[in-house]
Design a protein with these regions (language model features):
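Generic start-of-chain signal for non-secretory N-termini
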Residues: 1-42, 97-100, 605
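Mid-to-C-terminal polyanion-binding domains and interfaces
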Residues: 4-5, 21, 97-103, 341-347, ...
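Hydrophobic helix-and-loop "lid/oligomerization" segment in the mid-to-C-terminal part
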Residues: 22, 31-39, 43-161, 182, ...
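A residue-level signal for conserved active-site and pocket-lining positions in enzyme catalytic cores
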Residues: 57, 164, 319, 509, ...
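Short alpha-helices
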Residues: 121, 199-243, 254-263
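Short gly/pro/ser/thr-enriched loop/turn and capping motifs at secondary-structure boundaries
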Residues: 141-143, 172, 192-197, 211-213, ...
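Active-site core of PLP-dependent enzymes with the aminotransferase class I/II
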Residues: 166-180
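Short, glycine/polar-rich helix-capping loops at beta-to-alpha or helix-loop-helix junctions
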Residues: 189-200, 446
């Protein structure tokens, strides 16, 4: 197996394969410096691990003494005491009271995958305890994000006595004050950034509130719900609630929901999050959960589910219901126990996802044209802010993500409405906190509403405030963006030849997974391979084949690259010698295994 030796790097700048500017405009750098290479050697020697796996572990920041534990993440070993989170005791006791009394409970979730899976997880638990909770997922367009006064009043009219908000509620002052006024006690389980003033509720379980010292701010809402259920189970155990007829539920059997929400919300896959996903993937592979299995089947997964499948195939289909269809479809699917009904819902979500893709493509084309005109050929400026009439509010977050990837800087896409207001979403790059900037813009009167976290935010504004908001972002984020873009390089873990790329290699690398945000998938280079062909597939993807000098080849696919610099470089350099960089995946189809490279970048050799 060929691994590029350190001496082939430019040691002063660590340019990998001497690539200073690639097709995507980035330098390639070796992930490991001299200290990192020494750590990799120590990992390999002390733990009897293959050199390449040791290099990957060192690149992830793993120390020699912790390598074996890292390769086998254990929830038992990583699980914190839930009561270390502020208000967890009050929250678990109040929900336990509701279970003991048989109260009427309503779960108010968010319409994204994290909110849907968190709502489903809590609902399944309460059903096991004998309750029949209502799950309310708000309509993105007509209700917007988080609890609203009209919904609260309808819950009170229906006799609900306990409201649990998941993945929302921290900043819902007016709506939750109304809930208190109407006698509806509320528990908030959320992970979004908190303001100084908190709503008047029974408990707010949120590691991102200022007075929380748990250090668990990296958890998704579904992970927080899981910890809350651990605390509730403990509380009910102390009250002798569990019996032979009503045994304590096996929370580990529900980790498929935690894995799906954690990956889809792009929280760091480190520590407990990584263990959640590792064990949740095992649960998904067993195909024991009717709704999740129907979703995997309609998404046509080629092989056992991996984090990439959750984030790019399963998550978008759940999201499609909340974006352009019925917001409750995702929860209905994940709660469904009848296989035929689950299949019907999954097919409907798949149809909505295809419709969403068409809407997204059309909107992206308009947004890119506007961004290109604003930035100019030299792409000057810090933040990309685009807006358009008629844009579907359900896809603006996806459009912002596309713009962020295309231009390598924070991006906002805003759907302008006939009434003179706009609803939009922003996505950021590492090192630039747009959530904080948006909250400050609300306080300064530039936005009607807004919130989020470092990497994603939502905004509502008046159309006539658009220019002022754009100028504010340039001023507030400009220095951070400039610093982040200076560090914009592609980190390479090593180089392999086409002949060394096989299923054994991929399975070995998988031991350091699951990969995702905060635990990046290793990137390898194919040095000086001939680009045998590059073809358009699926309208926007590029499939390529790279051949080594000894005639061995690797098939690669560059997703959504056809109209991007990467796709253009592939089409223009057929039959030339290129360096290629990407991640290796194992594709299982019709009983056969083959390795495919998910192409990230290329450069002339």
């Amino acid at each position: 197996m060929a691994v590029l030796p350190a001496m082939q790097l430019n040691t002063a700048e660590r340019f990998f394969l001497s690539v200073k500017r690639s097709a995507t405009g980035r330098a390639w750098r070796g992930r490991l410096d001299e200290r990192g290479q020494a750590r990799a050697l120590a990992i390999a020697q002390r733990n009897s691990l293959p050199e390449l796996l040791a290099r990957v572990l060192a690149g992830l920041g793993v120390e020699p003494d912790g390598a074996l534990a890292f390769l086998d993440p254990s929830i038992r070993n990583l699980m914190p005491d839930p009561h270390g989170i502020t208000d967890m005791e009050a929250a678990s006791k109040r929900i336990a009271d509701g279970i003991m009394r048989g109260e009427s409970v309503v779960i108010f979730g968010d319409y994204d995958v994290d909110g849907v899976t968190a709502s489903t997880l809590l609902c399944r638990y309460l059903r096991h305890c004998g309750l029949d909770p209502i799950v309310h997922i708000p309509d993105r367009i007509f209700e917007g994000y988080g609890p609203n006064v009209d919904a609260i009043r309808s819950f009170a009219e229906r006799g609900m006595t306990l409201l649990v908000t998941v993945d929302c509620g921290t900043t819902s002052l007016e709506a939750l004050a109304e809930a208190k006024q109407l006698g509806l006690e509320t528990v908030v389980i959320d992970h979004h950034q908190a303001d100084e003033e908190l709503p008047p509720v029974k408990a707010i379980v949120n590691p991102n509130r200022a007075d929380d010292l748990s250090g668990l701010s990296h958890l998704a809402a579904v992970g927080l719900v899981f910890l809350t259920l651990v605390a509730i189970s403990r509380e009910l155990r102390q009250r002798n609630f569990w019996t032979g007829m009503r045994p304590e539920p096996d929370l580990l059997s529900l980790l498929h929901l935690v894995a799906l929400g954690t990956v889809a919300d792009v929280v760091p896959l480190k520590g407990l999050n990584r263990a959640f996903v590792a064990k949740g993937l095992i649960a998904l592979r067993r195909r024991e959960h009717v709704g999740a299995t129907a979703l995997m089947d309609v998404a046509r997964l080629a092989g056992p589910p991996q984090p990439w499948h959750l984030g790019h195939l399963l998550g978008p289909r759940i999201n499609a219901g909340g974006r352009i269809g019925r917001a409750d479809l995702g929860v209905r699917l994940l709660l469904e126990e009848d296989a035929s009904e689950a299949a019907r819902i999954a097919v409907e979500l798949d149809r909505l996802n295809r419709e969403r893709q068409q809407i997204e493509l059309a909107t992206v084309a308009q947004a890119e044209a506007e961004a290109m005109a604003a930035l100019g050929l030299e792409e000057k400026g810090g933040v990309v802010v685009t807006a358009g009439p008629g844009w579907h509010p359900g896809v603006v977050g996806l459009v912002a993500a596309r713009l962020k990837e295309r231009y390598g800087r924070p991006a906002f896409a805003i759907a302008l409405e006939p009434g003179g207001t706009g609803m939009g979403s922003g996505r950021s790059i590492v090192g630039v906190d747009i959530g904080q900037a948006v909250r400050r813009a609300v306080h300064e009167g530039l936005l009607l509403k807004g919130g989020g976290h470092a990497m994603a935010a939502g905004v509502t504004l008046r159309k006539d405030a658009l220019s002022a908001f754009r100028a504010y972002l340039e001023d507030a984020l400009g220095p951070a963006i400039e610093a982040a873009r200076r560090e914009r390089a592609l980190s390479i873990d090593g180089a392999v030849s086409g002949g060394a790329v096989n299923p054994t290699l991929v399975e070995m690398l998988a031991r350091a997974g699951p990969y995702g945000a905060g635990n990046p998938e290793p990137v390898f280079a194919l040095p000086a391979h001939t680009l045998a062909y590059a073809d358009l597939i699926g309208g926007e993807h590029v499939r390529a084949r790279f051949e080594s000098g000894d005639g061995k080849f690797v098939t690669a696919i560059a997703f959504r690259a056809a109209s991007q610099p990467l796709g253009k470089a592939l089409f223009e350099n057929r039959h030339r010698t290129m360096h290629a960089a990407g991640c290796f995946t194992l594709d299982r189809w019709q009983g056969k295994e083959r390795v495919q490279m998910r192409l990230i970048d290329v450069a002339p050799a």
